[in-house]
């Protein structure tokens, strides 16, 4: 995927506490591979908390997966539901784009990417 599409940057969801050990292990392995691939290709990688992604896409950090899917479909003008996993990936990509470009639809807020204390929303200086 990296060789075919040559992205300038990558974004992934931060680790969350999973109730299922097997799921957490598989997620950790997938994240590790994604981080390694981005690192080897010298592609900057940013992480976003699920709550931050939901805030950016739906306007509330506690949005349900169905709400995220619906907003991703509307935002990208998709005619078919991409499914939960694909919608999550697209939402993370949109969140990364919004945080970098200051997209006018989300111009009231500037998104800070991950810091050790977690992601957070800040009021954007409208005079800038």
Residue spans of the language-model regions?
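Phosphate- and other anionic-substrate recognition elements at nucleic-acid/protein interfaces
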Residues: 1-128
